[in-house]
């Protein structure tokens, strides 16, 4: 089905973008945009998608931290600790990704992960990474607990989902060691 409309969608997407450029920067630059696309000076990813609808998205996580998933149609309130943050974050990314074909970028993820680690384990948690913080059957150090939560998030993002045609989420994260 989608292939039938590909050529028309490309034309529509280019027209929508040309109109926006014209409104912002004038007719000359708008015309140059089309010329540059047609002569392959510019590349625009997946122009054949739904006209006027973005392929990828970068989100701010602040509304999620204040309202949870309620405003996205979910029932989860705002996360209160590291465990609820990681679990709800996974649901957030899957909820957003079901509305876009491309990647979901969450540039604030590590910053808020750090916030909830600090909330649960103290501002000086980096000084106590080797402390045992879980006394269940396996005694776990703080570094292992943090690693497990991070793995939970990453592994969950790699699970195929029905709302994405049984594909995994295309998730962008910046991680610097």
Where does each model-flagged region fall?
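Catalytic alpha/beta active-site cores
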Residues: 1-177
């Amino acid at each position: 089905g989608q292939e039938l409309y590909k050529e028309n969608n490309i034309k529509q997407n280019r027209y929508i973008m040309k109109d926006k450029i014209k409104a912002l920067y004038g007719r000359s630059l708008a015309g140059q945009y089309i010329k540059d696309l047609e002569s392959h000076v510019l590349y625009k990813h997946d122009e054949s998608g739904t006209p006027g609808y973005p392929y990828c998205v970068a989100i701010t996580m602040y509304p999620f931290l204040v309202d949870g998933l309620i405003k996205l149609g979910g029932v989860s309130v705002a996360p209160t600790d590291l465990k609820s943050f990681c679990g709800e974050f996974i649901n957030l990314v899957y909820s957003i990704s079901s509305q876009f074909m491309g990647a979901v970028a969450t540039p604030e993820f590590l910053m808020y992960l750090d916030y909830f680690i600090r909330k649960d384990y103290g501002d000086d948690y980096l000084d106590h990474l080797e402390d045992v913080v879980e006394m269940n059957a396996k005694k776990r150090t703080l570094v292992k607990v943090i690693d497990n939560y991070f793995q939970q998030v990453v592994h969950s993002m790699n699970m195929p989902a029905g709302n994405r045609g049984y594909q995994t989420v295309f998730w962008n994260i910046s991680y610097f060691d």
